[in-house]
Amino acid sequence: MFENLSDRLGTIYKKLKGRGVLKDADVDEALREIRIAMIEADVSLSAIKPFLKDVREKGVGQKVLKSLTPGHQVVKIINDELVSLLGGEFKELGLAPSLPTVILMAGLQGAGKTTTAGKLAKRFKDKGKNCLLVPADVYRPAAIKQLNLIGRDLEVEVYQAEGETNPVKICQNAVEAASGKMIHVVILDTAGRLQVDEELMAELKTIKEKVQPHQSLFVVDAMMGQHAAEVARTFNEAIGIDGVILTKMDGDARGGAALSINSVTGGKPVCFIGTGEKLDALEPFHAERIVSRLLGKGDVMSLIEKAETAYDLEEQAKLEKKI
């Protein structure tokens, strides 16, 4: 993932770090190139504009441009703003004070929601937590069958509706049943649609009102690019989401969805990324590691360390003069 954007940013960074003196025009040129690179990566314009504005405000000025290592300082600023754009520090899904913790999975049909529900269950099981998977997509018998197969493979209990066909009641009954057992986490696999519609949102709203999940996670295909962020915004405005899981990241060479979602949804973080079809192919979304990978790993991190060291030396010199 991010291959194309990584190549473009690497070239821009080499230009910046190779100049001993930077002018406002040099920073503006770099920002124009970054803008083009992000557009080509299918990043949403509503995410690009504030990002570039923040970088320019911090990267242009006497303090940075007259520092010992202006190019390195600007690289560090871009790095920090990219981390912020991606949502900052990863926060693990917490458990509720009392059992069970209820997680609602929402998203469009075909995003990989059912498989992702299984991946989450495996993640919790590996940490010693008992899970209950709830097949609430009554419109697709294949989804119910798939979740039962996943539960069998993981040796995780799957709730059996026993003839109930109302998805709201299925979720309510499942949570009630889990409350009488030592179930730590209940994962609700709700219905999807091929596109956003009022009926889907109304059903999800009712489930949320009746069940009161502790986490509502939106699952979306990363291959959709910036459109994934727009759909996430629609779901957030309609039902309120707490975070996003991006699937099929192993096939997304551009990374537009990952770079757009936090900004477009008003701060809803990408929590996890799916990197394959196997049930262990779910990774926490660490923004700093993603940016490190995006910007050339060790090379950029060494630049940032140099910039921080240079800044510390300058501050020390100023302090010594005052003394």
What are these regions (language model features)?
Residues 1, 26, 66, 70, ...:
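Catalytic cores of large soluble enzymes that bind and process phosphate-bearing ligands
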